[in-house]
């Protein structure tokens, strides 16, 4: 299991402990990828997981670019259309740095 996969598994467990329900992991399309799809009450939550073992080159949050946000939004819209879902959704970020985890709800 790669570091990225370990971070995603840890993020999934963390979100489940916070009351979210796991739906899918690593949903990929040619134009974008979604790390985790969760449900929180009536909302579908598309989660981007960022992990950095050290902050010397910028933290986990700094690793999220505007281009990545655009790709994640496109992938989420495509997922909703493919699954014929007309539901409220949001985009969260799990930023992991060394032994700390930060959950940004409705991050973008």
From Swiss-Prot:
SUPFAM superfamilies the UniProt entry points to: Restriction endonuclease-like
Family membership: Belongs to the UPF0102 family.
Protein name: UPF0102 protein Sbal_4100
Single annotated GO MF: nucleic acid binding
Gene3D superfamilies: 3.40.1350.10
């Amino acid at each position: 299991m790669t570091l990225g996969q370990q971070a995603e598994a840890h993020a999934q467990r963390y979100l489940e402990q916070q009351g979210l329900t796991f739906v899918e992991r690593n949903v990929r399309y040619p134009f974008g990828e979604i790390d985790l799809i969760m449900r929180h009450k009536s909302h579908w939550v598309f989660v981007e997981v960022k992990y950095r073992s050290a902050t010397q080159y910028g933290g986990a949050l700094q690793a999220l670019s505007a281009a990545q946000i655009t790709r994640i939004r496109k992938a989420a819209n495509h997922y909703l259309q493919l699954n014929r879902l007309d539901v409220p959704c949001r985009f969260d970020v799990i930023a992991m740095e060394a032994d700390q985890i930060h959950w940004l709800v409705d991050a973008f």
